[in-house]
């Protein structure tokens, strides 16, 4: 059973303590009524993983844990088998005691694009919205963050996160809650909020931006990464039934239009930090994610377009501040 008690105890002693007025009841309701049919199978995989304290832990350059003495072939096989029970692995990669989890996304490449543009994360309390397996949270801790809290309602991601955490010596500097941002009160408590790969899935993107703002302290920093298209400040793509085979894509603005959206929501010091085309080297099928990936979603005759005929995925990073 995945236990959130450590997180409750942690925030009871800091500036997130007011969250305890609503959070335990939400989690209890989730545990009682909303668990996925495979959740017990996934959580069992976490439970059966060995308790290991890493001798060497690198979260600054990667997510890598090593033991002082190499694990036996049997120990490595046990870890690999249990981690494979948590497939598909989409966000990573992870290198854990000789088990190399080659995820669908090279999330380390995204982090390398984002990190140089951030305010110093040292000592910060961070919220990562739509955090997936939690890869970027570990990198935030590696960059000096005091606490990283991730929210993502996908329960497989929760189990992947808890599996990695266990293999990192039960590290308590990062926590994942199985919630969506609409379930959070206006905490106004985070120094930095990340929303990466979420905005285009929201039916109301401006409402999402307001929700992000409500989580920030005054002068806090928002890091927003999302799909964009080329165009001026009035350009927004509203895809039909699907975009790159995804049904739940609603609005894809230009970076300039997105800048205006942020301005409309009251953000200041808005910067377009990076714009990059997503390549089939960054998002691809692997042994740890064996179903379709980006190459299958692009036009086989024109990789500059999706199979539906829209511009191929391009992502922008915007960084801004709540006054």
From Swiss-Prot:
The keyword DNA-binding does not apply. Its EC number is 2.5.1.-. This is tRNA U34 carboxymethyltransferase. Homotetramer. Keywords: Transferase, tRNA processing. Carboxy-S-adenosyl-L-methionine binds at residues 91, 105, 110, 130, 152-154, 181-182, 196, 200, 315. One of its GO terms (biological process) is tRNA wobble uridine modification. Belongs to the class I-like SAM-binding methyltransferase superfamily. CmoB family. GO terms for molecular function: transferase activity, transferring alkyl or aryl (other than methyl) groups. Signal peptide: none annotated. Pfam families: Methyltransf_9. InterPro entries: CmoB, Mo5U34_MeTrfas-like, SAM-dependent_MTases_sf. Disulfide bonds: none annotated.
């Amino acid at each position: 059973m995945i236990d959130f008690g450590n997180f409750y105890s942690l925030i009871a002693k800091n500036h997130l303590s007011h969250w305890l007025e609503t959070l335990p009841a939400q989690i209890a309701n989730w545990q009682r009524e909303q668990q996925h049919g495979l959740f017990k199978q996934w959580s069992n995989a976490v439970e059966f993983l060995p308790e290991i304290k890493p001798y060497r832990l690198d979260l600054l350059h990667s997510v890598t844990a090593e033991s002082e003495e190499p694990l036996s072939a049997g120990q490595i096989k046990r870890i690999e088998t249990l981690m494979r029970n948590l497939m598909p692995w989409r966000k990573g990669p992870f290198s854990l005691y000789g088990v190399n989890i080659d995820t669908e996304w090279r999330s380390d490449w995204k982090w390398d694009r984002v990190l140089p543009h951030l305010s110093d994360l040292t000592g910060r309390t961070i919220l990562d919205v739509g955090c997936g397996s939690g890869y970027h949270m570990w990198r935030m801790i590696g960059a000096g963050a005091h606490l990283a809290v991730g929210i993502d309602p996908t329960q497989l991601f929760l189990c992947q996160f808890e599996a990695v955490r266990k293999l990192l010596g039960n590290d308590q500097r990062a926590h994942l809650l199985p919630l969506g941002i609409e379930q959070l009160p206006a905490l106004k408590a985070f120094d930095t909020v990340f929303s990466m790969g979420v905005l285009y899935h929201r039916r109301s993107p401006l409402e999402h931006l307001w929700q992000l703002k409500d989580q920030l302290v005054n002068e806090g920093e928002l890091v927003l990464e999302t799909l964009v298209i080329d165009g001026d400040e009035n350009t927004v793509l509203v895809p039909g039934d699907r975009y790159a085979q995804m049904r739940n894509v609603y609005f894809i603005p230009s970076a300039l239009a997105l800048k205006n959206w942020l301005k409309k929501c009251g953000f200041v010091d808005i910067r377009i930090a990076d714009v990059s085309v997503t390549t089939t080297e960054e998002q691809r099928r692997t042994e740890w994610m064996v179903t379709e990936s980006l190459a299958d979603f692009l036009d086989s005759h024109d990789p500059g377009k999706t199979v539906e005929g829209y511009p191929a995925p391009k992502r922008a990073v915007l960084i801004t501040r709540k006054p």
